[in-house]
Each structure stands twice: as C-alpha cells, then as structure tokens.
C-alpha cells in the first residue's frame, strides 16, 4: 500500500524516494533517506498516513496535482531545519525570535538539545528573560489595555490602573512624580531618625525608662513615617490583582519586615500597661533587635532607583556565579588557613595564629585584599603563604566578576528600556506585541530575510510557481 493516495502529477517511484514540502510559500524537495539520518516526528507521521483525512491531520493542505504538502509555518525557521537535515547541525538564526524558533522546533518534533551549544545558551537566556518579564511586578498588558468596559467591574479596573500608575510609575504624570518624591523624602527622614536614635544620651534615657522631649520627638517622627509607609503599602495592595503574588514580591516582604517592629513594640507597650515594666525589660532585647530592622526602609529606594533594581536583578540572575565565587573562597580559605597556622605557630612561634579557625579570618581578609593588619605573618614561610593567598584571591575573584559585570549591564539596559516604554504608553503597546507578532511575521517573509542560514541548505530550496 502507498503511504498516501496516488496523485495524477506524481510518480510512485519518485514519491517513494522524495517528498515535496511547501512551508510558508517556499518549496523544498527532501529525500526520505535524509529524514532517516535525522528524523522529524511530523514528517514521519506524514509518511505513515494512509488516506487524505490522515494527511490533513498532519499538514495544512495537500496539492494532488503536484503531490505537494503545504504547512502554514515559518519558512525562516524551517530553513534551519533543512540545514540540520543536510549538514547535521542545528543553529539558531538571528532573524526570528528565539522563542518562536523554539515553538517551531516543537511543531516539527525536534529536540532542543540538537541545537549547538552557543545557540542553546542563547535560547535558555531568552527563556529566562521572558519568564522574568512575565513574573514582573507590573503587568504591562493590563496597564496598556484600553479600559472601555462598562459597569462596576470596568470602573474598578480603571481605578486600579490609575492607582497603579500613581504608585508604581513616576513618569505617568504629576501625581506619580509627587508620590515618588514624598516616598523618597520619608525614607530619608526615617534614615536620619534612625541615626539620631543611636546617640548616647538618647540611648541612656531609653535604658533608664525616661522620655525626654528629644525622645518624644523621635517617637512622633517615627510614627508619622510608619503611618505613611503603611498607607503606601495599603495602596499597593489595593492595586494588586493577585494578593498572593503581591505578598511574595521581595520588596513587599521587605516592607512587612520594616513595619513589623513598630507595631510589635506598640502592642507590647499597650499590653504591658503602666505596671508592666518587667514584661518590657524581658522583651527589651527582642525589641531592640526588631527595631534594628528599620534599616530595611532604605531598601524602599529600589522602587525609585533604576540602579538598585538593576543590582537586585543582577543578584538574582547571577546566583550561580555568586555561589561559584563563594565556593572558590571557601576552598582557598580551607587551604591557606592551615598552612599559615603551621608556618607561624609551629615555625615562627607566633600567638596570633593560635588555631586553624582563628586563621580562617586572616585567610578571608587576605584573599579579599582588605588587610586589617590585626594578624600579620612574620616568618618567611608565613609571608610566602600570605603572598600566595593574596595572589590566589585576586585571580579567583576575577573569574566570575566578568560574567557578573556583563549581566549587570544587560539588566540595566533592559530596565531602562522598560522605563522608557512605561513613560510612553503607545510604544509600550507596540513593544508588548512584538514577541507574539514575531512568530507570525516570519511566515510573511521569504527565507532570504534571515540571511544567516547555512549555505548548504540553499540548494534544497525551490521557489513556488515553477
């Protein structure tokens, strides 16, 4: 039995050896022997079809007169697949979107692992960027969608969008700029109040349980700042569509940790009452530790600072590099600490390096090129070990720094581009539709638009309309 019905335009022998495929307007004639070397799941299903209905489940159309199978897919992506069949190498083209190319590979039944290493790294990096964009705090699609819905639900969505623009986007207008300026001012006032609360005279009054006008003024100042931060946190929670995602956001967790100490100390003071001094004394250390968390207010500046957001994004993306840096440091520390202890304690009779754990501190300080000078090797073997540890620290810490620097530059450029799109709503809408339009855009372009496929595949292409 033939793999598919006999057509008037094709011969049975030719059909048994070759298959003619039309992908997005470009025709290619493939040999089944090439598919045997690198099988495509969809074309293998095509060969196994026994009737016209089975063919239409695999391809989009079938031309009986030409014995030709039509697929309404991207011709640029399929050109790379033809290069795989001819040369045995699958490369990611620079023209099409990387995510659209991944979808094409899934359609034709090709494993992503067949990509060359450099192309696979590029694809994985693009997938990570897309995942981070989807998990971002602002949903650009919801922001840019026109609010024309009628009724209470439409008015609620419009109100949320306006509130989101004021709270999260300083470039949305005068209200957003004023809100950002007030928020930054309160952060600065909180930092100044935290510094003043550590002055010796105010700390002495706190320990004696007294409340001078200075102490009372600082308490009022802190109360006003906490009230503003609580109000801002409430506004951000109201404009969030998903409360669980809002509470899981890192900056919102920092806000909760910064606000919690004030309310805990206030509740303990109210619960203790006038005669509850013993309860306050027992909880004094805990309260002081909790109040130290007020320094987290400074992290709120990340909402309004592009550099701080870039730093946080870099730390999240370079978690593996930071772990590698820590591993290098620990291995070198475990190597040089016993050596300097042996050289100084046993040979030089120095008491500074009393034990190997005490030498760990010296090893860390030396490899990071800080050099406090509290522990200094005096003997010649100890100085040789010190020189080796310093040089090793410089080399080991330089390896991951290059990758971290490039990641920071890329993160800063991406966030700056997002900020510019947020400042102009119309370009933002066009940019948001770019990723979804890229896959369909490729179908309207010829294979020559990519211009970077393997030249060995050019001989397989035949233009439609002979």
From Swiss-Prot:
Gene3D superfamilies linked to this entry: 1.10.287.70, Potassium Channel Kv1.1, Chain A (3.30.710.10), Voltage-gated potassium channels. Chain C (1.20.120.350)
GO molecular function (one): voltage-gated potassium channel activity
Intramembrane segments: 357-368, 369-376
Keyword terms of this UniProt record: Cell membrane, Ion channel, Ion transport, Membrane, Potassium, Potassium channel, Potassium transport, Transmembrane, Transmembrane helix, Transport, Voltage-gated channel
Cell compartment(s), UniProt: Cell membrane
Domain of life of the native organism: Eukaryota
Extracellular side: 197-217, 272-283, 342-356, 377-383
Membrane topology: Multi-pass membrane protein
GO biological process: action potential; potassium ion transmembrane transport; protein homooligomerization; regulation of potassium ion transport
Cytoplasmic side: 1-174, 240-250, 305-319, 413-466
Coiled coil: none
Compositional bias ranges of the Low complexity kind: 448-460
Cellular component, GO annotation: extracellular exosome; membrane; plasma membrane; voltage-gated potassium channel complex
Motif Selectivity filter per record, residues: 369-374
Tissue expression profile of the protein: Highly expressed in heart, liver, skeletal muscle, kidney and pancreas. Detected at low levels in brain, lung and placenta.
Biased composition (Polar residues): 435-447
Record-linked Pfam families: BTB_2, Ion_trans
Entry's transmembrane regions: 175-196, 218-239, 251-271, 284-304, 320-341, 384-412
Region of interest (Disordered), residue spans: 131-155, 416-466
Purpose: Regulatory alpha-subunit of the voltage-gated potassium (Kv) channel which, when coassembled with KCNB1, can modulate the kinetics and conductance-voltage relationship. Modulates channel activity by shifting the threshold and the half-maximal activation to more negative values. Potassium channel subunit that does not form functional channels by itself.
Quaternary organization: Heterodimer with KCNB1.
Similarity section: Belongs to the potassium channel family. G (TC 1.A.1.2) subfamily. Kv6.2/KCNG2 sub-subfamily.
Note from the entry: Heterodimers with KCNB1 are highly sensitive to inhibition by tetraethylammonium (TEA) and propafenone.
The protein, known as: Voltage-gated potassium channel regulatory subunit KCNG2
Protein species of origin: Homo sapiens (Human)
